[in-house]
A protein has these predicted regions:
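Acidic/glycine-enriched connector segments
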Residues: 2-165
Length: 165
């Protein structure tokens, strides 16, 4: 996995996703529909670059949704923000297959570190916030974890957060 495109992207035309790794799977299709609507609204408002951290759960679902919408939305770009090389090494087989397929289809892959380190996921979240004009979230209100950190950081920076929960 490597950065395939050396293009810098326009923050004003970028959205980042954040959400929980685990969610009520009976709501999967409802969540996917909400993601799809939010992505199309963002696209209709001029957003072209959609940044996913490619973690299991909402991140991969968001990446899948962007990928499925690209054919009908010219210029839509999927950017993978990977915290460290080998991120998917501990994923369950199904999630690993999904990750591998999506990485191959991503328009840009940005690997932030060659190796894992304790703060790498938070640094990835901060990278996404600092490179997005808006955050699309699936957040249940818990005041801990990466999703909470990402939303808090975005709000501190005055970045709009759309919560699909």
């Amino acid at each position: 996995m490597k950065k395939r495109n050396n293009n810098s992207f326009d923050r004003a035309k970028s959205v980042a996703f954040t959400g929980h790794r685990y969610y009520d799977f009976s709501r999967k299709e409802i969540i996917r529909q909400r993601l799809s609507r939010a992505i199309v609204v963002a696209y209709d408002n001029g957003i072209r670059n959609f940044i996913s951290g490619f973690a299991t759960g909402i991140d991969l679902m968001a990446a899948q949704t962007v990928q499925s919408l690209k054919l009908s939305h010219p210029g839509m770009v999927l950017t993978a923000a990977i915290p460290f090389r080998g991120q998917a090494g501990r994923f369950k087989p199904h999630d690993r297959r999904c990750y591998d397929e999506l990485i191959e289809k991503a328009d840009e892959v940005i690997v932030l570190s060659e190796h894992y380190y304790p703060r790498c996921f938070l640094d990835r979240d901060e990278f996404m916030v600092c490179n997005a004009a808006q955050i699309i979230a699936y957040y249940d209100g818990r005041e801990r974890g990466g999703t909470y950190y990402t939303i808090r950081k975005a709000r501190e920076m005055g970045i709009s957060v759309t919560n699909l929960y």
